[in-house]
Amino acid sequence: MAQEPRVSRRAFLAALGATSATSAKAQHAAQPFALPDLPGPLRPLGGLVLAPDMLGGGGFSGVHLAPDLTLTLISDRGHWAEARLLLDGLTPIGLQPLRHGPLRDEAGKPIPRGFAADAEALARRPDGTWLVAFERRHRIRAYRRLDGPGAYVAAPPGLEAAPPNGGLESLAVLQDGRLFAIAEIFTPPDRPELRHAWLGAPGRWTPLYWQPAPGFHPTDAAILPDGRALVLERRFSLLGGFSARLVMTAHDALRSAREGAVLRGETILLLNDAPLPSENWEAVAVTRLGDQTLVALISDDNESVLQRSLLLLFAWRG
């Protein structure tokens, strides 16, 4: 008869200690909080208060969530981080840091923090290539690995004329591999209510326009499995602080868009402290988990003690 393997007390306690340490580290990297239920196509699952020091720093401005729950973040301070989103059922309960590091230039050298390191949007192409859009020096870099060199790819034509702090903040990959990009505060001279936007790929961009709500600016976009786009829009005033809204395009808006088309969305979520927290909401991601579609939102703390890095998680029920 085969004997069951015996585990020594020392090995058992070591394994238990490692598990406890991992759990404590996950809890230290993010503290969960509950969200109220809301009507509409998004079912709130919960939120996390992130600990940026466990992720290499704050200032998160772009996010990607993979089906295996790997959360990838970029910062407008020029670094990236990976962590595992921990769920109890579908409720977020913690974040397990995996690795982090600086974004690098084409020679593999860390991009100096400051003007050149203002990374604002993150997307992943079907072949696994990461695309990172930068403001101030408006450009897009492509990375096979985020810890490797990042080569320039052709940005949308005319983007160099965008205001220093108003370039690409929204970058998303459609199911057919095309990119959807929106500039934050880059407007046509005769239509200040619009923002320059594009569909296509490096070297093959089709110019469009995005129309945000009055007073709002687009900060990120993600694509639902049915091809509709979610666009995150933010507003700030000295008296009112931050507020945001998440909007959704019509079913055929991206598929049928032609050069010069004006795209807009319908509001599906408000983030203005009633009842969801009002913060500097910067990034949105969509992924599939089994038969569920998950939507994640990330706020940018600007590395300020007056702001927070938050993650909100929703299940799509639209």
Where are the regions that the model predicts?
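Sequence/structural signature of beta-propeller domains
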Residues: 2-7, 12-318
